């Protein structure tokens, strides 16, 4: 599973997920991308589940690019613990995903293969997603 090697601070505030994504809103590396349509915290194990299901669908061919990284720690206090005594221990890591963010990209596969792989990966995620193609801009314009 993905997590940072080290961070400046062990724990973070929760923050807010308002507005659209600030960056990462276009297909940069592959031919097709999976875009988030809703805001959410995507856990590191959900990212890994998507990677596994897509790589199994492609078998040998195709390259998968993971465009999100879980860099936010989420803490949790133990069950049946009284309030107080500080913030809980880090339970898991999440990536803050806002609408319009390209989460995964694939290359070296057909459009049908990419569509099916993204459909399977979308079932592993807690948000609505859609597939987008890479936009090729003409240099003459």
From Swiss-Prot:
| Transmembrane feature ranges | none
Give the molecular function GO annotations: rRNA binding; structural constituent of ribosome; tRNA binding
Query: Which keywords accompany this UniProt record?
Result: Ribonucleoprotein, Ribosomal protein, RNA-binding, rRNA-binding, tRNA-binding
Please give the Pfam families that the UniProt record associates with this protein.
Answer: Ribosomal_L16
- One GO cellular component from the entry? cytosolic large ribosomal subunit
According to its UniProt entry, the protein's GO biological process terms are: translation
Q: Which InterPro entries match?
A: Ribosomal_uL16, Ribosomal_uL16_bact-type, Ribosomal_uL16_CS, Ribosomal_uL16_dom, Ribosomal_uL16_sf
Functionally, this protein is described as follows:
Binds 23S rRNA and is also seen to make contacts with the A and possibly P site tRNAs.
Q: Tell me the protein family, please.
A: Belongs to the universal ribosomal protein uL16 family.
Task: Extract the NCBIfam families matched here.
Answer: rplP_bact
Assembly and oligomerization: Part of the 50S ribosomal subunit.
Entries under HAMAP family matching the protein = Ribosomal_uL16
Protein name, as recorded: Large ribosomal subunit protein uL16
Q: To which species is this protein native?
A: Deinococcus geothermalis (strain DSM 11300 / CIP 105573 / AG-3a)
């Amino acid at each position: 599973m993905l997590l940072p090697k080290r961070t400046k601070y062990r724990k973070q505030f929760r923050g807010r997920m308002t507005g659209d994504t600030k960056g990462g809103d276009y297909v940069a590396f592959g031919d097709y991308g999976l875009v988030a349509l809703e805001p959410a915290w995507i856990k590191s194990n959900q990212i890994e589940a998507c990677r596994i299901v897509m790589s199994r669908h492609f078998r040998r061919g195709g390259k998968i690019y993971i465009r999100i990284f879980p860099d936010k720690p989420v803490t949790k206090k133990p069950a049946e613990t009284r309030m107080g005594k500080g913030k809980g221990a880090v339970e898991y890591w999440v990536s803050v995903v806002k609408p319009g963010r390209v989460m995964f990209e694939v290359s070296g596969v057909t459009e049908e293969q990419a569509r099916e792989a993204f459909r399977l990966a979308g079932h592993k995620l807690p948000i609505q997603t859609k597939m987008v193609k890479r936009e090729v801009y003409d240099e003459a314009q």
